[in-house]
C-alpha cells in the first residue's frame, strides 16, 4: 500500500471507494528496499499546491496517489486532470473515485492555461477521467484545453494522456486535430489481466486507437505505458511491446504497480530494478525511440525531460 503523508494540508483522507467496499482486503507483500516514497514537505510543493487550488483544478498527482508527487511538485511540475475528479469506470488498480460525474466546467480550459502560465511550465501534461456519460467522451473539452494553453503559453509543449474513447465515434479525430505534441494512451497491463484489472476497457481497441493517431497525424509522438507486478508473465510484456511497435508507438513506460488501498488489486510481485533494466534494453532493441522502465516510473514522471530526449532521438534517426 502506498501511503503519502501531506504535511501541508489538513484535509482528511478520502474514504475508501464505495464501489470497492464489499471486496475482501487484498494483501500485498512488503515493499522492498528499492521502493522509496518521498514525503511532500518542500516549499516548492506548497507553492504548486496553492496554484492548483487557486485555479480550482484537479491533478492526477493527488487523485491517483502518485508516489512521485513530492519530487514533481517541488519542481513545479503537475499533471492536470480535466473533466472532474470522478470517473465512470472502476478499474481495480486506480485510486481515482468512481461515480456519476458532474457537468463539465466551460471555464476549465482557461483555468488550466492560467495555472500553466503561473507555474512557468515548459512542458504540460493533461489527463482526464473516463467520461463514458458524454457523447464524445470529453474529446471537445480536451481540444478546447489544448487550444487555450496554446494561446496563453505558445512555447509550452503539450502532452495528453487520454482515455480510450470507447464507442465514441469521431472523438479521437477531434483531439488529434488540436495538435498536442505527445499523444499518450496507456494499455496499463497485459491482455490476460484486463478482466481483473481493467474490465471496462478493450486491449485491442487501445492498440487500434494508438495506431489511428499515427494515421491521422504521423508527426505526433505517441506514447503508452504498462504497470508490472499484477500477475503478468515476462513473455506477455514482450508481446505488448510488439503490439505497440506494430502501432508505431514511439515511447514506452513501464513501472511497478503499487496498491492504493487494500480494496484495490494486490501487488502480486515486486519486479527488481535489474528486470526493469532488461525490459528497457529489449524495448530499445524492438525499435522504441524512448523507453522509461523502473520501479518508480509513471507516465508523467520526468515528462518534460523525456520529451526533449524523444525529440532528439527522432531527429537523430532522420539524419
Curated annotation (Swiss-Prot):
Location of the protein in the cell: Cytoplasm
Binding residues for [4Fe-4S] cluster 2: 87, 91, 94
Residues spanning the signal sequence: none
Catalytic activity reported: [[Fe-S] cluster scaffold protein carrying a second [4Fe-4S](2+) cluster] + N(6)-octanoyl-L-lysyl-[protein] + 2 oxidized [2Fe-2S]-[ferredoxin] + 2 S-adenosyl-L-methionine + 4 H(+) = [[Fe-S] cluster scaffold protein] + N(6)-[(R)-dihydrolipoyl]-L-lysyl-[protein] + 4 Fe(3+) + 2 hydrogen sulfide + 2 5'-deoxyadenosine + 2 L-methionine + 2 reduced [2Fe-2S]-[ferredoxin]
Cystine crosslinks: none
Positions of the UniProt region annotated as Disordered: 1-28
Domain Radical SAM core intervals: 73-289
Pathway the protein contributes to: Protein modification; protein lipoylation via endogenous pathway; protein N(6)-(lipoyl)lysine from octanoyl-[acyl-carrier-protein]: step 2/2
Cofactor stoichiometry and binding remark: Binds 2 [4Fe-4S] clusters per subunit. One cluster is coordinated with 3 cysteines and an exchangeable S-adenosyl-L-methionine.
EC number: 2.8.1.8
GO cellular component, one term: cytoplasm
Alphabetized SMART domains for the sequence: Elp3
Annotated residues for binding of [4Fe-4S] cluster 1: 61, 66, 72, 300
Cofactor: [4Fe-4S] cluster
Enzyme class, spelled out: transferase
Gene3D superfamilies per UniProt: Aldolase class I
Transferase as UniProt keyword: yes
Molecular function, one GO term: lipoate synthase activity
Keyword Cytoplasm: yes
Keywords annotated in UniProt: 4Fe-4S, Cytoplasm, Iron, Iron-sulfur, Metal-binding, S-adenosyl-L-methionine, Transferase
Database matches in HAMAP family: Lipoyl_synth
Family that this chain belongs to: Belongs to the radical SAM superfamily. Lipoyl synthase family.
UniProt name for this protein: Lipoyl synthase
Upper taxonomic lineage: Bacteria, Pseudomonadati, Pseudomonadota, Alphaproteobacteria, Hyphomicrobiales
